[in-house]
């Protein structure tokens, strides 16, 4: 891993530590990670539901546009609700996350996470997207349960001809 990438990760982690040191932010993270709303719902909300229903962040931009701005700025690995890099964590990732656990230990601990997941949920907390999802939860849930990707619909239609 290049030193520029490691440096970027360290800068990101330092900003995450600063953000989550605030008790209210850390409590919001714990509520999100331990709450009734699944990570899949967060992902589908920002990538699909918010587009179809033109959901806005109050006083800011569209949820979907903001999400893509973050992806452009960070990459999927550094902005991921699922924390998918677990199986391939590098020594740098492990060391950085140990630093995170150590730093916020006075407030609490977050286990089994990644820098990308912490970054994604910082964006969720800063923009009160968790509150938006909660206020529209039944509609979001229905949308997700009934959602069928275009590829599947086209394949199904081809099979019926």
Positions of predicted regions on the chain:
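Long, highly charged low-complexity segments enriched in Glu/Asp and Lys/Arg with interspersed Ser/Thr
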Residues: 126-155
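Long, compositionally biased non-globular segments that serve regulatory/targeting/scaffolding roles
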Residues: 1-98, 115
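Intrinsically disordered, low-complexity regulatory segments in eukaryotic proteins
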Residues: 100, 105-115
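Alpha-helical bundle/repeat cores within regulatory domains of eukaryotic proteins
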Residues: 103, 117, 123, 143-146
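Amphipathic alpha-helical interface elements that mediate macromolecular binding in regulatory proteins
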Residues: 77, 118-123, 127, 131
């Amino acid at each position: 891993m290049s030193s520029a990438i490691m440096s970027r990760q360290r800068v990101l982690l330092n900003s995450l530590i600063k953000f989550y040191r605030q008790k209210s932010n850390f409590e919001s993270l714990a509520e999100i990670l331990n709450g009734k709303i699944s990570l899949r719902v967060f992902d589908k909300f920002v990538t699909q539901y918010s587009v179809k229903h033109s959901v806005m962040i109050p006083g800011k931009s569209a949820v979907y546009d903001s999400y893509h701005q973050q992806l452009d700025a960070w990459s999927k690995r550094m902005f991921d609700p699922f924390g998918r890099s677990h199986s391939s964590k590098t020594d740098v990732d492990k060391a950085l996350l140990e630093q995170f656990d150590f730093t916020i230990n006075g407030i609490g601990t977050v286990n089994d996470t990644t820098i990308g997941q912490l970054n994604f949920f910082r964006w969720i907390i800063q923009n009160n997207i968790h509150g938006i999802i909660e206020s529209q939860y039944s509609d979001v849930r229905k949308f997700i349960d009934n959602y069928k990707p275009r590829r599947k619909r086209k394949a199904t239609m081809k099979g019926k001809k």
